[in-house]
UniProtKB/Swiss-Prot annotation:
It comes from the Bacteria. PROSITE patterns: RIBOSOMAL_L20. The keyword Transmembrane does not apply. GO terms for molecular function: rRNA binding; structural constituent of ribosome. GO terms for biological process: ribosomal large subunit assembly; translation. The keyword tRNA processing does not apply. It comes from Mycobacterium tuberculosis (strain ATCC 25177 / H37Ra). GO terms for cellular component: ribonucleoprotein complex; ribosome. Binds directly to 23S ribosomal RNA and is necessary for the in vitro assembly process of the 50S ribosomal subunit. It is not involved in the protein synthesizing functions of that subunit. CDD domains: Ribosomal_L20. This is Large ribosomal subunit protein bL20. Belongs to the bacterial ribosomal protein bL20 family. Keywords: Ribonucleoprotein, Ribosomal protein, RNA-binding, rRNA-binding. PANTHER family: 39S RIBOSOMAL PROTEIN L20 (PTHR10986).
Length: 129
């Protein structure tokens, strides 16, 4: 069986790893083994954080909606409850955008939600205090 010489392939692979690891700090950008380890970690972090980003944006939208809702004397929880009761299907991303860019429209949505809410949520059903 013929001997396999891997010089070209090995150098090509090392060169591509070192090229991808430019910008890393210290040995991680210069030594192949350190660069390879760092690249594995970097790709894992990128994969994980692409998924985490979705939750972070949702938290941001909720914080913005809550801040705008409290300016209209209603809590985020009651606003969402009222919008669902009124049958308004606006997702949190668009609701946050409306809250920032068009406060008058957001106030109109708050009024719709307030009208759809029952008078006293804490009272037993059928008895308004």
């Amino acid at each position: 069986m013929a001997r396999v010489k891997r010089a070209v392939n090995a150098h090509k692979k090392r060169r591509s790893i070192l090229k991808a690891s430019r910008g890393y700090r210290g040995q991680r950008s210069r030594l192949y083994r350190k660069a390879k380890e760092q690249q594995l970690h970097s790709l894992n972090y990128a994969y994980r954080d692409r998924r985490a980003r979705k939750g972070e944006f949702r938290k941001l939208w909720i914080a913005r909606i809550n801040a705008a809702a409290r300016l209209n004397d209603i809590t985020y929880n009651r606003l969402i409850q009222g919008l669902k009761a009124a049958g308004v299907e606006v997702d949190r991303k668009n609701l946050a955008d409306i809250a920032i860019s068009d406060p008058a429209a957001f106030t109109a949505l708050v009024d719709v939600a307030r009208a759809a809410l029952p008078e006293d949520v804490n009272a037993p059903s059928g008895e308004a205090a």
